Amino acid sequence: MLILPIVKGEYKKDYNLKHLTWFKVGGNAEIFFKPLDREDLKSFLIQNKQKLPIKTFGAGSNIIIRDGGIEGVVIKLGQNFSNIEFIDNHLIVGSSCLNYNLAKFCQANAISGFEFLVGIPGTIGGGVAMNAGAYGSEFKDIIVQIEAIDFAGNFLTFTNEEIGFKYRSNNLPKNLIILKAVFKINKGDSENILLRMNEINNARSSTQPIKERTGGSTFANPAGRKSWELIDKVGLRGYRIGGASMSELHCNFMINNGDATAKDLEDLGDFVRQKVFEDSGVKLEWEIKRIGRHP
């Protein structure tokens, strides 16, 4: 019998996750949990005596939920984890804050260095987890430290060096939920910051399928190479499996054309990886997370 910890937040059983993802595909979460606050989250983790499997869920922008859904508990941090505040010449930002919202906040407060976030879908927590980056900047360039909680309910702090940022990854221990990030502040000019943000937005809209059901870059760039060039070289721009296709506009982006399943998307990605490897010997690494069970 499934026994759930007593919490102040909200549980939903057999909860459909499809509508929360940018791809609009996937199955249900066995249990969906939105904690009220950090103490509620801690209480849940401490009480999880059955060791129910745990997955965290952000903005749903860089993820494929498999069609068989997710066993155990999916935790989504809500608005109470999205605050932005100034403390001792640093920005303290909740992990569920959207990258775009932080970029706009920094522009309004003449803080430079965050312009690139306007072009990165998702949350601060997800950005830290994958060292998200674009247009010459990455999270590693602006982070001072993070606060997290492990699955045993212990609050932990990691400095930039301890996080061990790498290209689209880090060396953090597994089974962590990122709660806050501390950023350094560099003052700038609001108008110049806005100009740079507009440049980034214009570049995105002209080169990426941002109005489609997509999940951002599908594959990380191999060292010294561009994934899209390798994909284009094997003629897979626009290639389709089921309801999923590689974008005609940017062939490192997968698109749900309206009737794709998670299997269509994952099969398409694996097919692209196979063809690129056969042609160039390069193993493309997924940048999009795939979680859950196959049907």
Curated annotation (Swiss-Prot):
Q: Where is the FAD-binding PCMH-type domain positioned along the sequence? A: 24-188
Q: What is its subcellular localisation?
A: Cytoplasm
Q: Name one GO biological process term.
A: regulation of cell shape
Q: What is its main location?
A: cytoplasm
The yes or no answer to whether the keyword Cytoplasm is present is: yes
- What is this enzyme's catalytic activity, as reactions? UDP-N-acetyl-alpha-D-muramate + NADP(+) = UDP-N-acetyl-3-O-(1-carboxyvinyl)-alpha-D-glucosamine + NADPH + H(+)
Question: What are its GO cellular component terms?
Answer: cytosol
Question: Which intervals of the chain form a coiled coil?
Answer: none
- A single GO molecular function, which one? FAD binding
Biological or metabolic pathway of the protein: Cell wall biogenesis; peptidoglycan biosynthesis
- Give the keywords, sorted: Cell cycle, Cell division, Cell shape, Cell wall biogenesis/degradation, Cytoplasm, FAD, Flavoprotein, NADP, Oxidoreductase, Peptidoglycan synthesis
Q: What is its EC number?
A: 1.3.1.98
- Report the superkingdom from the record: Bacteria
Q: Which residues form the active site?
A: R168, S217 (proton donor), E287
What is its cofactor?
A: FAD
Summarizing the function annotation, the protein's role is:
Cell wall formation.
Q: NCBIfam families attached here?
A: murB (TIGR00179), PRK13905.1 (NF010480)
**Family stated for the protein in its record:** Belongs to the MurB family.
- Name this protein carries in UniProt: UDP-N-acetylenolpyruvoylglucosamine reductase
Which species is listed as the source?
Rickettsia massiliae (strain Mtu5)
